[in-house]
Amino acid sequence: MNQELATNPLNPLAAPRQFDEIKISLASPEEILAWSYGEVKKPETINYRTFKPERDGLFCARIFGPIKDYECLCGKYKRMKYRGLVCEKCGVEVTLQKVRRERMGHIELAAPVAHIWFLKSLPSRIGLMLDMTLRDLERILYFENYVVIEPGLTDLSYGQLLTEEEFLDAQDQYGADAFTANIGAEAIREMLANIDLAATAEQLREELKEATGELKPKKIIKRLKIVESFLESGNRPEWMVLTVIPVIPPELRPLVPLDGGRFATSDLNDLYRRVINRNNRLKRLIELRAPDIIVRNEKRMLQESVDALFDNGRRGRVITGNNKRPLKSLSDMLKGKQGRFRQNLLGKRVDFSGRSVIVTGPELKLHQCGLPKKMALELFKPFIYSRLEAKGLSSTVKQAKKLVEKERPEVWDILDEVIREHPVLLNRAPTLHRLGIQAFEPILIEGKAIQLHPLVCSAFNADFDGDQMAVHVPLSLEAQLEARVLMMSTNNVLSPANGAPIIVPSQDMVLGLYYTTMEREGMKGEGMAFTSLEEVEHALASGAVHLHARITARLPQIDENGNEVITRFETTPGRLRLGALLPKNAKAPFELVNRLLRKKDIQNVIDTVYRYCGQKESVIFCDQIMGLGFREAFRAGISFGKDDMVVPPTKWDLVEETQDQVKQFEQQYLDGLITQGEKYNKVVDAWSKCNDRVTDAMMKTISATKKDEKGAELEPNSVYMMAHSGARGSVSQMKQLGGMRGLMAKPNGEIIETPIISNFKEGLTVLEYFNSTHGARKGLSDTALKTANSGYLTRRLVDVAQDCIIREHDCGTDHAITASAAVNDGEVVSPLSERVLGRVAAEDVLVPGEDVVIVRKNELIDERKADEIEAAGVQNVRIRSALTCESDDGVCALCYGRDLARGTLVNIGEAVGIIAAQSIGEPGTQLTMRTFHIGGIAQGGQQSFIAAAQEGTVAFENESTLENANGELIVMSRNMQLHIKSATGDTLASHKLFYGSKLFVREGDAVARGQKMFEWDPYTLPIIAEKAGVAKYVDLISGISVRDETDDATGMTQKIVTDWRSAPKGNELKPEIIIVDQDGEPVRNEQGNPVTYPMSVEAILSVEDGQEIKAGDVVARIPREGAKTKDITGGLPRVAELFEARRPKDHAIIAEIDGYVRFGKDYKNKRRIAIEPADDTLEPVEYMVPKGKHIPVQEGDFVQKGDYIMDGNPAPHDILRIMGIEALADYLIDEVQDVYRLQGVKINDKHIEVIVRQMLQKIEILDSGDTTLLKGEHVDRDEFEEENAKIEAKGGRQATGEPVLLGITKASLQTRSFISAASFQETTRVLTEAAVQGKRDKLVGLKENVIVGRLIPAGTGGATARVRRIATDRDQEVIEARRAEAEAAAALIAPEDTPAEVGGED
């Protein structure tokens, strides 16, 4: 590889080699010798007196090249004229000193040595080739055991290990020549050299056909794959054992003299010295015919020293230097954050850059930034020099330099010229998304701080409390062009994550705009009428009218036809001011701002202006409202005072009331009416409710409008204005200042029962203060952890998606996914219009029930179309998606849809993968790190009923109910749903009904808003009798499977099912309650099965043995704790868990087929559940469930494919296998979105789809057909299709496979590009594997191109590559045409000549 990339040493200006791919493979000894310029024989480095390299040493000039340019070591030949000559005295070639960076040497080893990467990197490649375990290999290599290489006619077998004694005995028994056995790396080399790859592969294929069981085929496939990769790549197995070691060029492992006669050296020199020393000693020992044991020891030491050189610390103890620090080996040079890949190739330092503190620059325009003069002078030096020379102010660069250093006046004039129209890039670390680097035009300022426009702060996430930013200068014309056209801050108005404007006023500006658009009664000038804006301004200035007075005024508007019309409005002077700034457009009417504007409203205004009035107008508008906001906030003089925090007068009444309640609960607990857990829940519940009521009372007090004696409305409370407008602060912060602080959490996440009743204004008691320190500290440590975790998630996401680029306009696929509104707990959290906006329709969208097309197939759905779809009441739309795109290497534009940051169809070459990764990763720091334990936490108080949110009629789905003795309807199904339908039949809301819920409505009932529809017990899960009869206990034996719990305080006894498996003779028991009739015969259900209720551990029995029961009675209750003690993983860990596709701990079991449930014979501690398929052609499916787990299905229940047989979180792999790709994508998107929605972060679904697409790139082969693919192997989708296409062309049987879901880390490591994978994680493993397979990296992704130092194949880089490709094709055509013409001409001239000669001339 080095040779391929190295430049020609004789010609210093040789052009860099153009290459299309990089291949990595094992180096044969011959190749190593071919690279080498000589053998390093001595461990010496430099003569410390003369500082000249020792001959034949590690820095030898004869091998590696001269120390000074064009000068040999002894100084006989100097200067250019002797170039290329080899000095006969010192043997040094006269050439550039630079060749010492590229010439390699070698060491001839006296004994072969196994390469540690191929030995120890799991799975061990040498071990696989020889079919030996790693332990056996090490025994041979480190001279403990002999191995039989050629058994001859003896009873020994090939590959058998022999101890020293056994070996000697065998020699005595069979004679010394009857068999061959050897020890050490020689033995292994010999065995590897004897392998016939083709024959081995053939034999393995035969074995694979006959192999049965689970593990054997897997093992054979592993060996077969490695044997085949050796065959294909042309590598030989024995090359994994080294006989020659390359020595890297000396300039790459420098030795630098420090003052005081000491040297600073690279660790590699120490490691090489060790190898050379031991190698020379071994040579001498062999020459001296030393005893075997000594030679062996020396060989072992040589093996160890070579191991340390390649990968120190991988085997045995770490070799340390003189200061007890481990030496950095060749592997360590590549690995980790400080390794070559991540430190120097992916993260380079940049020239022409500077950094400084930022301050706010409110008088800048949006596309400008203030650059300190000093910085600009330094950054633009070369430009200034050339301009000075061009103007004749200096004749040489040296002179120009002097002028600049003295800072003469003419230099400043020139700096102004240079800087004009030359954008610079500003970057703030951490750059979490692409808006973290934007281009601005510099404006020269005095001082030393960079001025930043306030509106771009939110994109950079910058504030002015000492943040620093870096400035970079784009040098070439192309770079300046890209900076201006693509990166200018004015082009980044919309966020790529969700398409909403990101240039939005914040803080003071919001407050100013809120204050401007306020309207108050009874202000001065109320009811006046004005003819024009100028008149209003005049009146304001003279004090005749107040900013908030309600007035009537005329304002010119644009109507639908684009004509100007004067319209009258009821408004306030403040709103008129704002309205005057709106661009004149029919789509941006004055009504847009004729109301009280909060932060969200301002964002909508900007969005509307951007969509309909274009970029230029909206940028000007943003700048103007920023100015207005700052100005008005300053004039309003809104400030924050202690008295602005109002403590509600009713607070103490509410607190006392709650304290009484808590006392009652304590008493109930002492009386034994409730358990400790229930008491805890109720207390926490009560305090949360109290907290909410105090907060409501405070908000009522604080937001109430007050009037003065003249009846004029007073200004609202200033703190309320800040919070309400969205400028700063929130209700919860106000609650802590003026209400009560409320409940606090312990460090482990549990809630402390006693709340903090005081607020900050009143001051906390010592105890309260102590209780609140827990949470506060946890918050701080969480934040630190969160940042690191979030960054790591982003890194993994970027790595998995980096090669996902828009490659073509249309892939022509027929596949699509269905989009529908997202509903959570009966609430529509994101409407259909939001989910289809910016997507491409996969088929015509029609108005329901009519033949009217809203959107044509392959048409982009914009805002207007989305609203039409919503208005027409369409329920779901088939849209194209990145998941179903069929492009090779990337996605097509139609499947992706709109580029959210531009608002138009995405361009070819856009790096959508990276944008997706950034959009998901960037808000990561806002997510929580907490895992919620529901160890009885009242999460906002457990809900126990649901009331109708809309009015409509009730409709049930999968109805299965039962009337109990009191005439109440009880839900008996697990997948019954209640829908509320509108008059037109649209579903307004839908609720999942829990088993055992009581229904208050019937099918077809009309419900009003707020009407209670159904309720359930939030703390227990009931088991309900479906038939009347007598309850009979089975295997419910007191003391073995049932314990009687008597509460001391109350004397009440409950029967509770215990874990019967732990009891002696308990394993055979199947505790259940059956229902029998009066004669003791089991009552049967509709399917004819006996009615039985298996009991799970911790269930509380509600009926006695032999008690008569009616249908609908509760037989037993399972505490919800038991049914639901799983932690709810929230926030970042949940997102990571989903993208890593981890199986949840207690994952749900999902039915794979439609059929009937049967309970089979039980195992020791597992229950067997079978599903008998409804379709007779299918096989029954069996599942094992731990005994004592609650199973929600009964014998004979009909389940549908995809139903849960056991509760829990489903494993994403199961969803993919059973329900398919679309269901998996829906699940992942919904789950990820739920986490982000909780934090109020909006991310477009398509970003998650892109990542899921990348997780589904591999296919597992189920049947290999006639292809060379192996069963059970994971291959890339493209490879799979290529292989099948080849076989189809030959008419053979195609391979079949199913998609596999890989977590993002695994998917990144299994990418086709080994360079990208190696720079991500597990560098050694990736490179080892790639070398054995002789992999070629085609350089298609972004990362590999950055690493080899080319333009990335995305954006403008992709465009130039495309143009170049087209040009080459055209040239090729022209050349072909000319050749054809020439041949035709030649044929005309010499028709009697043989055609062979014509071809020869060419």
Curated annotation (Swiss-Prot):
<keyword id="KW-0548">Nucleotidyltransferase</keyword>
<dbReference type="InterPro" id="IPR000722">
    <property type="entry name" value="RNA_pol_asu"/>
</dbReference>
<protein>
    <recommendedName>
        <fullName>DNA-directed RNA polymerase subunit beta'</fullName>
        <ecNumber>2.7.7.6</ecNumber>
    </recommendedName>
</protein>
<comment type="similarity">
    <text>Belongs to the RNA polymerase beta' chain family.</text>
</comment>
<feature type="binding site">
    <location>
        <position position="87"/>
    </location>
    <ligand>
        <name>Zn(2+) 1</name>
    </ligand>
</feature>
<dbReference type="InterPro" id="IPR007066">
    <property type="entry name" value="RNA_pol_Rpb1_3"/>
</dbReference>
<feature type="binding site">
    <location>
        <position position="74"/>
    </location>
    <ligand>
        <name>Zn(2+) 1</name>
    </ligand>
</feature>
<feature type="binding site">
    <location>
        <position position="811"/>
    </location>
    <ligand>
        <name>Zn(2+) 2</name>
    </ligand>
</feature>
<dbReference type="Pfam" id="PF05000">
    <property type="entry name" value="RNA_pol_Rpb1_4"/>
</dbReference>
<dbReference type="InterPro" id="IPR045867">
    <property type="entry name" value="DNA-dir_RpoC_beta_prime"/>
</dbReference>
<dbReference type="Pfam" id="PF04997">
    <property type="entry name" value="RNA_pol_Rpb1_1"/>
</dbReference>
<dbReference type="InterPro" id="IPR007083">
    <property type="entry name" value="RNA_pol_Rpb1_4"/>
</dbReference>
<dbReference type="Pfam" id="PF04998">
    <property type="entry name" value="RNA_pol_Rpb1_5"/>
</dbReference>
<dbReference type="Pfam" id="PF04983">
    <property type="entry name" value="RNA_pol_Rpb1_3"/>
</dbReference>
<feature type="binding site">
    <location>
        <position position="463"/>
    </location>
    <ligand>
        <name>Mg(2+)</name>
    </ligand>
</feature>
<feature type="binding site">
    <location>
        <position position="90"/>
    </location>
    <ligand>
        <name>Zn(2+) 1</name>
    </ligand>
</feature>
<keyword id="KW-0479">Metal-binding</keyword>
<keyword id="KW-0240">DNA-directed RNA polymerase</keyword>
<feature type="binding site">
    <location>
        <position position="885"/>
    </location>
    <ligand>
        <name>Zn(2+) 2</name>
    </ligand>
</feature>
<dbReference type="InterPro" id="IPR007080">
    <property type="entry name" value="RNA_pol_Rpb1_1"/>
</dbReference>
<feature type="binding site">
    <location>
        <position position="467"/>
    </location>
    <ligand>
        <name>Mg(2+)</name>
    </ligand>
</feature>
<dbReference type="InterPro" id="IPR038120">
    <property type="entry name" value="Rpb1_funnel_sf"/>
</dbReference>
<dbReference type="GO" id="GO:0003677">
    <property type="term" value="F:DNA binding"/>
</dbReference>
<feature type="binding site">
    <location>
        <position position="72"/>
    </location>
    <ligand>
        <name>Zn(2+) 1</name>
    </ligand>
</feature>
<comment type="function">
    <text>DNA-dependent RNA polymerase catalyzes the transcription of DNA into RNA using the four ribonucleoside triphosphates as substrates.</text>
</comment>
<feature type="binding site">
    <location>
        <position position="895"/>
    </location>
    <ligand>
        <name>Zn(2+) 2</name>
    </ligand>
</feature>
<dbReference type="GO" id="GO:0003899">
    <property type="term" value="F:DNA-directed RNA polymerase activity"/>
</dbReference>
<dbReference type="GO" id="GO:0000287">
    <property type="term" value="F:magnesium ion binding"/>
</dbReference>
<dbReference type="GO" id="GO:0006351">
    <property type="term" value="P:DNA-templated transcription"/>
</dbReference>
<dbReference type="GO" id="GO:0000428">
    <property type="term" value="C:DNA-directed RNA polymerase complex"/>
</dbReference>
<dbReference type="InterPro" id="IPR044893">
    <property type="entry name" value="RNA_pol_Rpb1_clamp_domain"/>
</dbReference>
<keyword id="KW-0808">Transferase</keyword>
<dbReference type="GO" id="GO:0008270">
    <property type="term" value="F:zinc ion binding"/>
</dbReference>
<keyword id="KW-0804">Transcription</keyword>
<dbReference type="InterPro" id="IPR042102">
    <property type="entry name" value="RNA_pol_Rpb1_3_sf"/>
</dbReference>
<keyword id="KW-0862">Zinc</keyword>
<keyword id="KW-0460">Magnesium</keyword>
<feature type="binding site">
    <location>
        <position position="465"/>
    </location>
    <ligand>
        <name>Mg(2+)</name>
    </ligand>
</feature>
<dbReference type="Pfam" id="PF00623">
    <property type="entry name" value="RNA_pol_Rpb1_2"/>
</dbReference>
<feature type="binding site">
    <location>
        <position position="892"/>
    </location>
    <ligand>
        <name>Zn(2+) 2</name>
    </ligand>
</feature>
<dbReference type="InterPro" id="IPR012754">
    <property type="entry name" value="DNA-dir_RpoC_beta_prime_bact"/>
</dbReference>
<comment type="subunit">
    <text>The RNAP catalytic core consists of 2 alpha, 1 beta, 1 beta' and 1 omega subunit. When a sigma factor is associated with the core the holoenzyme is formed, which can initiate transcription.</text>
</comment>
